[in-house]
Amino acid sequence: MSSQTRVRVLSLYKRVLRSHQILPVDLKHLGDAYVKVEFRQHKTAGAKFVEEFCTQWESYASDLESKESSRLHDINIT
């Protein structure tokens, strides 16, 4: 894995864990554990696979972040 790819994956890993902050505690712990296992298992994956792996996790993180943004927006309105 190139150093540029490594930085991308590490940044994504941190982003996903940060996005779990909005989840209830029990789901956060479950999600964090799952993310750690997934990223650890795919440490040695080929470049082609890493691209798809990152795309899927970026989509997941974006989804959680949009839900958080929506939730914060709803709180500010009411």
Regions found by a protein language model. Name each.
Residues 1-78:
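Intrinsically disordered, low-complexity, basic-enriched segments
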